[in-house]
Amino acid sequence: MAKQRPATLSVYLYIPNIVGYMRVLLNCIAFSVCFSNKTLFSLLYFFSFCCDAVDGWCARKFNQVSTFGAVLDMVTDRVSTACLLVILSQIYRPSLVFLSLLALDIASHWLQMYSTFLSGKTSHKDVKDSTSWLFRLYYGNRMFMGYCCVSCEVLYIILLLIATNQTENLMNVVVKSLMQISPLSLLLALSIFGWSIKQIINVIQMKTAADVCVLYDIEKQHKKP
């Protein structure tokens, strides 16, 4: 008699993955009103971002960690940030600043994921063998990583909210906002600091991942007869 396969819950219906679908839906609604209602957009976008921590907690709590869930999580994060950066590039000048940030974000994370598969690691956050102390600190300390990630999103949301014209000079708006002594200026300063660290991490991540790819090519050539 053939051995019956155990009944298992479809990976697509894992609780953390359902949370991921909700994040996608929230982002779709948010970006549909990003120009007509910036306050609603900010609330929906930030709530979706906060749910990023919820799906990770659910995955560990219910033992529903999956490769699909990890990919869905990263793709949702990258696409959400990319869309917001594109919007900011239409509001602020020079727009190349935000397009460059978009390129760095996508390139660094894509290379990191690809190098993870090449090295046989199970997670792109496994950087114990990295020579960069800042890189190890970032992925080894959840609080520090959370601060940097939240800072990026908060900074981008603030920039969207304080823009009053269709085209703004980025430096003028940032300097003017920082000069005003207020809770907003303090939040902006804290966000800029965390954002700066995150961009440094992205550069280190891209270089480290590129080194892994190059090393893989060298080792493959040496194995050839």
UniProtKB/Swiss-Prot annotation:
<comment type="function">
    <text>Catalyzes the biosynthesis of phosphatidylinositol (PtdIns) as well as PtdIns:inositol exchange reaction. May thus act to reduce an excessive cellular PtdIns content. The exchange activity is due to the reverse reaction of PtdIns synthase and is dependent on CMP, which is tightly bound to the enzyme.</text>
</comment>
<dbReference type="GO" id="GO:0003881">
    <property type="term" value="F:CDP-diacylglycerol-inositol 3-phosphatidyltransferase activity"/>
</dbReference>
<keyword id="KW-0443">Lipid metabolism</keyword>
<comment type="similarity">
    <text>Belongs to the CDP-alcohol phosphatidyltransferase class-I family.</text>
</comment>
<keyword id="KW-0808">Transferase</keyword>
<feature type="transmembrane region" description="Helical">
    <location>
        <begin position="84"/>
        <end position="104"/>
    </location>
</feature>
<dbReference type="InterPro" id="IPR000462">
    <property type="entry name" value="CDP-OH_P_trans"/>
</dbReference>
<feature type="transmembrane region" description="Helical">
    <location>
        <begin position="143"/>
        <end position="163"/>
    </location>
</feature>
<keyword id="KW-0812">Transmembrane</keyword>
<dbReference type="InterPro" id="IPR014387">
    <property type="entry name" value="CDP_diag_ino_3_P_euk"/>
</dbReference>
<feature type="transmembrane region" description="Helical">
    <location>
        <begin position="6"/>
        <end position="26"/>
    </location>
</feature>
<feature type="binding site">
    <location>
        <position position="66"/>
    </location>
    <ligand>
        <name>a CDP-1,2-diacyl-sn-glycerol</name>
    </ligand>
</feature>
<protein>
    <recommendedName>
        <fullName>Probable CDP-diacylglycerol--inositol 3-phosphatidyltransferase 2</fullName>
        <ecNumber>2.7.8.11</ecNumber>
    </recommendedName>
</protein>
<dbReference type="Pfam" id="PF01066">
    <property type="entry name" value="CDP-OH_P_transf"/>
</dbReference>
<dbReference type="GO" id="GO:0016020">
    <property type="term" value="C:membrane"/>
</dbReference>
<dbReference type="GO" id="GO:0008654">
    <property type="term" value="P:phospholipid biosynthetic process"/>
</dbReference>
<dbReference type="GO" id="GO:0005783">
    <property type="term" value="C:endoplasmic reticulum"/>
</dbReference>
<feature type="binding site">
    <location>
        <position position="52"/>
    </location>
    <ligand>
        <name>Mg(2+) 2</name>
    </ligand>
</feature>
<keyword id="KW-0594">Phospholipid biosynthesis</keyword>
<keyword id="KW-0464">Manganese</keyword>
<keyword id="KW-0444">Lipid biosynthesis</keyword>
<keyword id="KW-1208">Phospholipid metabolism</keyword>
<dbReference type="GO" id="GO:0046872">
    <property type="term" value="F:metal ion binding"/>
</dbReference>
<dbReference type="InterPro" id="IPR048254">
    <property type="entry name" value="CDP_ALCOHOL_P_TRANSF_CS"/>
</dbReference>
<keyword id="KW-0472">Membrane</keyword>
<feature type="binding site">
    <location>
        <position position="77"/>
    </location>
    <ligand>
        <name>Mg(2+) 2</name>
    </ligand>
</feature>
<dbReference type="GO" id="GO:0005794">
    <property type="term" value="C:Golgi apparatus"/>
</dbReference>
<feature type="active site" description="Proton acceptor">
    <location>
        <position position="77"/>
    </location>
</feature>
<keyword id="KW-1133">Transmembrane helix</keyword>
<keyword id="KW-0460">Magnesium</keyword>
<dbReference type="InterPro" id="IPR043130">
    <property type="entry name" value="CDP-OH_PTrfase_TM_dom"/>
</dbReference>
<feature type="binding site">
    <location>
        <position position="73"/>
    </location>
    <ligand>
        <name>Mg(2+) 2</name>
    </ligand>
</feature>
<feature type="binding site">
    <location>
        <position position="55"/>
    </location>
    <ligand>
        <name>Mg(2+) 1</name>
    </ligand>
</feature>
<feature type="binding site">
    <location>
        <position position="56"/>
    </location>
    <ligand>
        <name>a CDP-1,2-diacyl-sn-glycerol</name>
    </ligand>
</feature>
<feature type="transmembrane region" description="Helical">
    <location>
        <begin position="184"/>
        <end position="204"/>
    </location>
</feature>
<feature type="binding site">
    <location>
        <position position="52"/>
    </location>
    <ligand>
        <name>Mg(2+) 1</name>
    </ligand>
</feature>
<feature type="binding site">
    <location>
        <position position="73"/>
    </location>
    <ligand>
        <name>Mg(2+) 1</name>
    </ligand>
</feature>
<keyword id="KW-0479">Metal-binding</keyword>
<feature type="transmembrane region" description="Helical">
    <location>
        <begin position="29"/>
        <end position="49"/>
    </location>
</feature>
<feature type="binding site">
    <location>
        <position position="60"/>
    </location>
    <ligand>
        <name>a CDP-1,2-diacyl-sn-glycerol</name>
    </ligand>
</feature>
